[in-house]
Amino acid sequence: MLAGNTAGLTLSSTLLAGVNEGGTILAVEAEHRLINGGVSFDNTQSEELGRQQGQIRAVINSPTGLGETISMFGLARPTIKGMKGTGADVPIRAGGVAISLPIGNDGLTTGISYMESMTRPGGDAIDLGLEANMKSATATVSYPLVYKRDKAVFFRGTLGWTDEIQQTNIGGEDQDLSHDRITALRFGVSLNRCLTGCLGIDLQFSRGIDIASRSLGDVGEGTPLSRSSGKNNFSHFKLDTTYAVALDKNLEFNINTGGQLSLDDLLNSEQSGITGPDKLSGFTSGSISGDESWCFRGQLNYKKKL
C-alpha cells in the first residue's frame, strides 16, 4: 500500500494462470508520471479582492528516484493585469513551493514548504489604501501509526513560521499598521476509517514559542501587533471531522463538522474561519473568523449524467 502512494506512481494488478496446475500468479504493473498539474478558477474571494481567482499548480514526482515530490503553485486574479500588473489591478497574488521526501520504507515522510502572499482590497475599501503581505514556512514530519486498506492513523509534527505586515498608503507613502511574527509547534493525529461510510477525524494542538517571533514586549514604540491583547505564545486545539456515505447509486450524504478551541487571545493568522466550500459556502471565504469557531454542514449530492 505504501508503494501505491509513491509520488507519481500508479499501480495496477491482475491474476494470471500459474505454471503449475491450479496455480495463480499476481502480476503488478507500475506506471510513473514525472510531471502533473492543473489550472482552476473559482469565485470564492470577496468583492474587495476581485471575486474571481485563478490558480495554477505543477508537481514533479520523484525526479531523482527517491520518492520525493516538488510542488509549486501560483494564484492571482485571472486577468493579464491581475497576473502581471501592479497597484489596484492586483487585488490578490500568492505563490509557493513545497518539497516532501519519504525516509525509509515504513511510511515516515518529511517535508518543507514556503509561501508568500499579497492582498490589496479594492471596492469600497480602495480609498483606505490597504495592503497585507504574508510570508510563511513550515517543516513537517509525519508517520503512519496504522495503515490498512480500510483504516489509517497518521501522526504529524510541524514547526511553522509566519510573518504578516498590514499597511496603508492613504497618506501617499507606505505606513505599517501592524506586524505579526509567529513561530509555532503543532502536533496532530488524523484517522480515516471506511465501513458503511468513510469517516475522517483530524485533531491538532498548536503552541506558539518565542523563537523568531514578535511579542508585545518587542513592539515598544514601533509597529503594533494586529491585536493588542494577542499572544505569540498561544495555545489552541483544532478539530475537523468528515463523514460520507452512499445512500444510493447516485446519491451521497456528506457531513462536515469542526472548529477551534483557543486558550488565549490570538493574532490574525492563528484565528479560525467557518466559511468556505466545505463549511458555510453562502458567505465569502474568510469573512467570518475568530479565536474560537464551530460549524456543522450537511449536504446531499446527487449525480446526474447529462
Identify the role of each PLM range.
Residues M83-L191:
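Transmembrane beta-barrel wall of Gram-negative outer-membrane proteins
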Residues L15, V39-N43, I70-A76, I112-E116, ...:
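Transmembrane beta-barrel strands of outer-membrane/channel proteins
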Residues L26, I56-A58, V97-I99, A139-V141, ...:
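Membrane-embedded beta-strands of outer-membrane beta-barrel proteins
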